UniProtKB/Swiss-Prot annotation:
It is an enzyme of class 3 (hydrolase). It holds the Pfam family Ras. Its EC number is 3.6.5.2. It comes from Mus musculus (Mouse). The keyword Hydrolase applies. This is Ras-like protein family member 11B. Keywords: GTP-binding, Hydrolase, Nucleotide-binding. One of its GO terms (molecular function) is GTP binding.
Amino acid sequence: MRLIQNMCTIAEYPAPGSTAADCCLGAAGRRLVKIAVVGASGVGKTALVVRFLTKRFIGDYERNAGNLYTRQVHIEGETLAIQVQDTPGIQVHENGLSCSEQLNRCIRWADAVVLVFSITDHKSYELISQLHQHVQQLHPGTRLPVVLVANKADLLHVKQVDPQLGLQLASMLGCSFYEVSVSENYNDVYNAFHVLCKEVSPKQQPSSTPEKRRTSLIPRPKSPNMQDLKRRFKQALSAKVRTVTSV
């Protein structure tokens, strides 16, 4: 899979035929793949999405912004339009999983789901089984493609979840598993999305097919400016250089 350079970040799911849709989805007839990234708060969902789409790690993100990112990818000889929906963190209460209607709409909208937990947070791992069941319940009669991602693999000194547990869980759920460090390794992040796109793409209709859902998936999400992301990345890089120089 090869990422194509132009990328859009949009606050609402664009109506087909609109300027935003033309910008983000490209030429008519290109298949559209819609992916929702879901997990507990603080596991690195936004960082994972931005890393995949830009190859960069900034390290400073606004939590629970609920942004919808769009770009084109080239996979096995075909150019796809891919939309990745970042979602607010899921809360767990005594009565079980607490999913807002906005989150449910995102999951129903998606063609595939990335389930994310952090190796530094065992509760985020425990949440995955319930979350996977909830995802499948929102897609009755079909088995939605899913990939399981364990993030923060570089933080071994505070690890609470061993890789073997992730593998066992993925085997039980019937999905692929990747342990990644979003901050240090782009290739593992790339591979996780690559596998998911391969599972989804043969089944999808061209992006010119009218979409029933034209409303915002999450009300009034704040759409980050990509120039601002680049600026913050440069600032973070400059700060690291100054630190090394002063030592």
